[in-house]
């Protein structure tokens, strides 16, 4: 069982993401924004982080930079969650250091397989 940290401000999206992940036997830690992200990362040590790009306050790119600076080599895979599906958006996210990229609304099968692909073997 992996621990997955989800940073998502939309309660409906969080509910769906949590359901898809927990039905596969994984634990979810959810945050509605990035204010508690660093301390939650240190306390929970998740296997993977799903980080919404558009959050109130600091966006996903700003939060990723903070994580990279604070955790460096200890940073788990961080997958971008975004409604941005324009040409070049995925490349921009991957260039910034995101490990993966998922667009919303999600396809449940793609979402699940992407999350599973980034969970390290037990």
Question: Which residues does each predicted region cover?
Answer:
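Short amphipathic alpha-helix used as the core "switch/output" element in two-component signaling
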Residues: 39, 61-74
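C-terminal output helix
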Residues: 106-115
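Two-component/phosphorelay signaling modules centered on CheY-like receiver
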Residues: 11-29
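Conserved acidic carboxylate
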Residues: 8
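Active-site residues of response regulator receiver
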Residues: 52, 82
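The feature encodes the CheY-like receiver
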Residues: 56, 86, 104
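Acidic catalytic/metal-coordinating carboxylates
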Residues: 12, 33, 59-65
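Short hydrophobic/Thr-rich beta-strand motif most characteristic of the beta2 strand and flanking loop
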Residues: 25-34, 39-40, 102
């Amino acid at each position: 069982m992996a621990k997955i940290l989800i940073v998502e401000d939309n309660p409906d999206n969080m509910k769906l993401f949590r359901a898809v992940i927990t039905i596969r036997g994984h634990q979810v830690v959810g945050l509605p924004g990035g204010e508690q992200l660093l301390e939650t990362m240190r306390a929970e040590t998740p296997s993977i982080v799903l980080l919404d790009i558009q959050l109130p306050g600091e966006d996903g790119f700003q939060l990723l930079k903070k994580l990279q600076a604070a955790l460096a080599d200890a940073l788990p895979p961080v997958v971008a969650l975004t409604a941005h599906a324009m040409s070049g958006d995925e490349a921009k996210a991957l260039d910034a250091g995101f490990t993966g990229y998922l667009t919303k609304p999600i396809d449940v099968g793609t979402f699940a397989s992407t999350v599973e692909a980034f969970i390290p073997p037990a």
